[in-house]
Every structure is written in structure tokens, then in C-alpha cells.
From Swiss-Prot:
Its cofactor is Fe cation. GO terms for molecular function: homogentisate 1,2-dioxygenase activity; metal ion binding. This is Putative dioxygenase SSO1533. It comes from Saccharolobus solfataricus (strain ATCC 35092 / DSM 1617 / JCM 11322 / P2). The lineage of its organism: Archaea, Thermoproteota, Thermoprotei, Sulfolobales, Sulfolobaceae. InterPro entries: HgmA_C, HgmA_N, Homogentis_dOase, RmlC-like_jellyroll, RmlC_Cupin_sf.
């Protein structure tokens, strides 16, 4: 994250002896980009390197839909099966070397495994459900409309209080956009959200012994390891790198007399993509405004939108839970009669919630996307 935070008990100085109840605590530097990036210091009851058993390695190559035409896509996640596990069995739909977009439907209950994504930061957008996120940093309660942002390398698990549907983004260097931060890391006036909107982890320490199964994910697969001490044995931590949650309903959308580009709603930025959030807001209010998106030839980008709730005015035939992929080089925009209908909406409010991922690198669609794809969608501007 962008500001300093601390939880639990800490020594007065870093890298010094820290005793608790007569026992030496084990300090871990949890950091990005070697020793030059953001980091936190965690203090464990036990060495975090302690592995009791090395388990199974399972490869995990995303199957590509190799004969897919280069066209727009509409995917209906309502047709997807349930995931047996949110980490091992999430369903990858759209991907490239630096981005994976997945969806997961998970039943109520506790996950039996602990997770650690070694290669990618993760964003879980909670389309529906209630979840208790548990990690080495502590716990965060998340619910419908929340983003849960997890730095790569974080050890965590999830407890589902209700059946849940999750739109999942994996990528490198997912951060709060630099334009929102001043030189001290504080979110500036006019940014899409403020520091106090973020839900931060509350530390809970587990001093327990047993058999704990941890799955480490890389781009190539999953490695299972077994531990004899609980991985959440942290008694205190501080720093600038930790998970957090943010509700889309706490966002502060920028509106204008004339239509604002999607980048006005940038929520997170990564190496090769941005995440934008369309939330309920005032439509454009110039007396001659066209309060709907213009036609767009996004030559250098691929645009993925997840439609969560409300009415997305520029689209027809879109249901909650649908995903569209608008290809770079193909023009996209409002469907027939949508522009005319929007003219009566000047100065009124919309109720849409949608998540947009725009990437600068071409994406592939998976074999799972093929199963839920609407092949008529590219023609919908002609046939609507």
C-alpha cells in the first residue's frame, strides 16, 4: 500500500533481538523488487522457513482457445460450473503473460488449504457473497462490492460466510495509481478514493501446532508443502506492503459537463494494465452533451469489462455477471439506438457497477471461455 501501517507487538528497533515470553521472535522481511521496493517486517513465533514435508507438484497451463477468431467476445459467467477450490480451481478466461482474469463460484464454508501466489498480485472483486480473509497480516471482512487486494507472496486463506462469486485479476505490480499520491504517499485531493476508505487487516495470532497444507502458485503450477506450525503465527508487523480492501460504493467518481474517458475511473494500476471502476454517478450535464460513451478504436489496448450490477446504458443484452472483451483494432461503442436514448438522461443518475481491465498487450481467450461465449456478440451492433 502507499502508507505506513503497524499491528501487534514490535521491537523498538528493526533487526534487533525481540523476546516474547522468553522466546526469540523470528523477523521476516516481506518485500518487492529485492531490497529496493515496498516492504513490511513481520515477527513470527516460529521460523517461517520451517517445512515439514514437500508435497505434490501440479502443473497448471491455461488451455488456449487456439482457433478463436480475432473479434469481440461476450462471456456469460452464469453458465460456469462451481469451483471446487478458489485457488486451485478458479476458471481462467482471459490471459496474457502479465495478466490472468478468472472467475470462481464458491460454496459457503472454510477453505481447507493455505495459499500463496508467488508470481502475481491478486485482486478479488466480490460480485456476491461474504468472506473473511485471513492472512499473516491479519483478517479483513469483505462483502459484495468489495475489492480485496493481495500482494504476491502473501500467505492467506478464505472463509466463505455465504456462497460467493468472484471476479479475479492476477498481475504484476498492482498499486494505487501514482497520480493519486503525493510525494509522501498520501492520497491527494481529487483522487478516486482516500486513505480512510481502505479496510486494513486486523492482526490475529495463531500459536498452534498441527498439519497445515500450503499451496504455492507459480505461472507454471502449484507446489504443495506441509507445515507443523500455523502459518499465521505473526505477533506483530509494520511497513508499507500489506493486503487491503476497498468498496466500490466508497469511490468518489469524477463527473463533468461532457463525457469523461474510462481512465477518469482508474482504481488500480499495474505494469501493463489498469483497473477502472464504473459506479453510480451523475450523467453528463452540458445542455448538448451526449451522456454515453463515444465509439472507440482502442488500437493499442484490449478492454475487458465485468458487469456486476445496474443498467449499463451503452449495452443491450448484457446480464449481471457477463464479461465483454473488446479487441484492439476493432471499433466498439454504443449499440444501435443507445445514443439517441441517452439524450434524455442528461443530468440524471445511473446505477451501474462494472469493472474494466484495459491492457496494453494482446490477450488470449481460454478453452473455458469458448464454452460460455456468445458468437453473435460481434454482430450485435448490426442486428440490435
Amino acid at each position: 500500500m502507499v502508507f505506513y501501517h503497524r499491528q501487534g507487538e514490535l521491537p523498538k528497533k528493526r533487526h534487533t533481538v525481540f523476546m516474547k515470553d522468553g522466546k526469540l521472535m523470528r523477523e521476516e522481511v516481506f518485500g518487492l523488487n529485492g531490497f529496493n521496493g515496498r516492504y513490511s517486517l513481520l515477527y513470527h513465533l516460529n521460523p517461517p522457513t520451517r517445512i515439514m514435508k514437500l508435497g505434490e507438484w501440479k502443473s497448471n497451463t491455461i488451455g488456449e482457445w487456439k482457433d478463436a477468431e480475432y473479434r469481440h467476445h461476450k462471456l456469460s459467467t452464469s453458465k460456469l460450473r462451481k469451483s471446487s477450490d478458489v485457488f486451485l480451481d478458479r476458471i481462467a478466461l482471459i490471459f496474457n503473460d502479465n495478466l490472468i482474469i478468472s472467475f470462481s463460484k464458491v460454496d459457503e464454508g472454510d477453505t481447507k488449504l493455505f495459499y500463496r501466489n508467488a508470481d502475481f498480485d491478486e485482486i478479488y472483486y466480490v460480485h456476491s457473497g461474504e468472506i473473511l480473509f485471513k492472512s499473516v497480516f491479519g483478517e479483513i471482512e469483505v462483502k459484495e462490492g468489495d475489492y480485496l487486494v493481495i500482494p504476491r507472496g502473501t500467505t492467506y486463506t478464505l472463509s466463505f460466510k455465504k456462497n460467493a462469486e468472484l471476479f479475479i485479476i492476477e498481475g504484476k505490480q498492482i498499486e494505487v495509481p501514482k497520480d493519486y499520491r503525493n510525494e509522501y504517499g498520501q492520497l491527494v485531493e481529487g483522487s478516486f478514493y482516500y486513505n480512510r476508505d481502505l479496510k486494513l487487516p486486523v492482526l490475529r495470532t495463531y500459536d498452534e501446532n498441527g498439519n497445515y497444507k500450503l499451496v504455492i502458485k507459480t505461472v507454471n503450477g502449484f507446489q504443495l508443502v506441509e507445515l507443523d506450525t500455523h502459518p499465521f503465527d505473526v505477533v506483530g508487523w509494520d511497513g508499507y506492503l500489506y493486503p487491503f480492501a476497498l468498496s466500490v460504493y466508497d469511490l468518489e467518481p469524477i463527473t463533468g459537463k461532457l463525457h469523461q474517458p474510462p481512465t477518469a475511473y482508474t482504481t488500480f494500476a499495474a505494469d501493463d494494465f489498469v483497473v477502472c471502476t464504473f459506479v453510480p454517478r451523475l450523467f453528463d450535464y452540458h445542455p448538448q452533451s451526449v451522456p454515453i460513451s463515444y465509439y472507440h478504436n482502442n488500437i493499442d489496448a484490449e478492454e475487458i469489462i465485468f458487469y456486476s450490477s445496474g443498467q449499463f446504458m451503452s449495452r443491450r443484452g448484457i446480464n449481471k455477471g457477463d464479461i465483454t472483451l473488446h479487441r484492439g483494432g476493432h471499433i466498439h461503442g454504443p449499440q444501435p439506438s443507445a445514443v439517441e436514448a441517452s439524450l434524455n438522461k442528461r443530468g440524471t443518475y445511473n446505477d451501474e457497477v462494472a469493472i474494466m481491465v484495459e491492457t496494453q498487450k494482446r490477450v488470449k481467450v481460454s478453452i473455458y471461455a469458448k464454452e460460455i461465449d456468445d458468437p453473435t456478440y460481434p454482430l450485435s451492433w448490426y442486428t440490435s
